[in-house]
Every structure is written in C-alpha cells, then in structure tokens.
Amino acid sequence: KELGVALVDIGAGTTDVAIFSGGAIRHTAVIPIAGDLITSDIAMALRTPTKDAEDIKVESGYAKQLLADPEAQVEVPGLGDRSPRMLSKQALAGVIEPRVEEIFSLVQQVVRESGYEEVLSSGIVLTGGSSVMPGMIELGEDIFLKPVRRGIPKYSSALSDMVAQPRAATVMGLLEEARLARLRGFKVAQKSGSMKTAFGRFKDFIVGNF
C-alpha cells in the first residue's frame, strides 16, 4: 500500500474498489455488478435454476475460457421436468468470461478516473468469494496489464482454514476493526463520520494483512 495498490472486493451484489498510495486510502468506488450477476448469466444461458447455477459457478466455473479443459464436463440440472444435460467446462466459461471482463473493465475505468493508475506499483489485489474462481488472476492481468493476486487474510489461530481465504476478508476486516475500536475505548458507531473512517481503516487492515 505504500507503493500503490488497488483492492478489489468482488462480493455477491457489488464490487468495491479502494485505491491506496503512500500508505493511505486515496479513492473508493462501488460498482453494482458482481458475483450474483455471473450466477444469473449462467442460470439464463443454461436454463437452470439459480441455486443450481450458483453451485455450477462455484464448483466448475472458469473466468477465462482458454484455461478451461474442453474435455471436462459438468452436469446442468434442467428447469421443471426437463432432464439434466452435460456441458463442457469450456462452454460454461464462455458464459462467465464476458461478465467478469465487464467487471474488470469497470474497475479499470474507476482506476483511470481516480488519477492513480500510474502509481499502482503493487498492482491489483482481489478479494471476495468470486475472486477464488480459476482464471480470475489471468484474466485480470490481461485487462489491467498489472500484477494481480488474491488477497488472503493472515490468520494462524483456531479455524485458520476457514477464515484465511479471500471470501472471509470482509468479515475478518470488520472483526479486526471492532477489536481495535474496543482497544481505543470508543464505539465506532458513536464517532462523527465513523462510517467513512471505519471503511478506510477496514480496507487498510485488509491490504496490510495479505
């Protein structure tokens, strides 16, 4: 974060962007496109229930079509009385990649408009549940033309296997902020302008713990 980094948290409903430079948060943005729309694309394209589309995305999804094994197959449950059918993982990736590319392109637009694009020497850090999908790093580097990596919270105590992963980054950041607030002897919610301050400290924690 001293050299410059963009934190991109791809959640279910939104993609949150925070840009750091010189050890401080410089710009934030919220993009209303994220993992849920990827799931919706799969459900519509494959004509399968949303719940099954989510399972297919998590278990078999690839963000970059060229990386998916064309021989590997995934079972797609049908709607209503329709029988399930088989689909190649590469064809599935063909549904997913355009939406991920759109998300990354919007993030790139945010970075450019922020005026900090040239100072992101440390590149892009991806967090959130969707960031673990195979191919996200490779597609991100194609679009951003910068180093891209997943952010994993540093946690070595009990349940580390559960929480030391990108999808847990937001929860871990909020818990850490609550702990620090208690140590400081005040409640974050009672402080004037605390939401903006808490957001900044939360993002600072996330980047500092990868």
Task: Give residue ranges: language-model regions.
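Helical "lid/coupling" subdomains associated with nucleotide-phosphate turnover
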Residues: K1-L7, D16-F210
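Short, glycine/acidic-enriched loop or turn micro-motifs at the edges of active sites
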Residues: A12
